[in-house]
Amino acid sequence: MKILKTLYTATLCAAMAVSTSSCLNSWLDQSPADGIDAETAIKNSDDLANVRTGLYAAVQGNSSLINYYGRLMFVYGDMRGEDIQYEYNGGSGRANFYYYMEYTTADNFTTSTAVWQMPYVVIARANRLIQAAESGNLTDAAEAKATIDQYDAEAKVLRAMALFDLTRIYGKPYTVDQGSSPGVPIATSPLESTEKPSRSTVAQCYEAIEKDLTDAINSNALPKTNEVGYVNLWAAKALQVRVYMTKGEWSKALSVAEDIISNSSYKLWEPSEYVAAWSKSDANHSKEIMFEISINNNTDWTDREGIAYLYADKAGASPGYGDVIVTKDF
């Protein structure tokens, strides 16, 4: 009996020790406080709406994420053109790098000197939304079908826009060699961090861009009305026009442009309206603008790293960095 009692006591103590150890270490198994499991986070259309918000936030950028429409994408076109140049006498170094490209890797990549990371963040978030929307696994897939389809179509337009921008920056113009030269990597599904897709040709990039736009437009899920800060049908078609024009497909571009002119509510500003219309409070502000990035509060804006500070003269009424000035020829 003494032996059995000893064995029982030892077994009980061991069980208690395992149980106590498990309880003491259970705090190590908590979900990350700053992240969500991508595979289980999107359960219904409300979750999908949150992903949509994150998608548009990536397009907006902020003071830490300026390497897309937060700043760099706007300035890139000016600096690589003929009318704007860097101010070498006293510039802050925030715009001189637009004149050159240099090889970099993920180990020393900086988000402030290349239009690269954030467009792919936009693509990654769009991929996640599209995958969830088309999975058929959302709990309210039937009753919220119209909303889900709209978010899906919007994501395809933004994915096309990001790939279009990347292709134009890092690939040769399509008309040079009909797109046979290297473009950028195409991602149409969520990627693992270890994946390194190779560069597709410019033609393949445009094929993916056109497919996304065509699918979004033909889905009949995009609204025709204007919701500030969000993609609608006419914005998608306007982007389609730009794609066709970039490829030199003028008849296609004209056909879609005439559709927009004839059937949408958008009209060009009159010369007398042009200056005032840039103010969001002006009655004509949305008359011509089909899609604009909405900045709602101080968490959305780029603060001192935005284009306003870059262009503002150091000695002006609202002084900035004065990095960007007009050329003498202009």
Where are these regions (language model features)?
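Sec-dependent bacterial lipoprotein signal peptides
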Residues: M1-S22
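Membrane-proximal, proline-rich intrinsically disordered regions
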Residues: I3, C23-G77, A315, G320-D323, ...
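Aromatic-residue-lined binding/catalytic grooves and analogous aromatic/hydrophobic interfacial grooves
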Residues: C23-N25, W234, L239-W269
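Hydrophobic-face positions in mid-chain alpha helices that act as interaction patches
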Residues: N50, G70-M73, K252-F330
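Inward-facing hydrophobic residues that define packing positions of alpha-helical scaffold repeats
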Residues: R52, I123-A126, Y206, L213, ...
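Conserved, well-structured interaction surfaces
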Residues: S92-Y170, N218-A221
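Short coil/linker segments at helix-helix boundaries
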Residues: T139-I148, I169-A203, E207
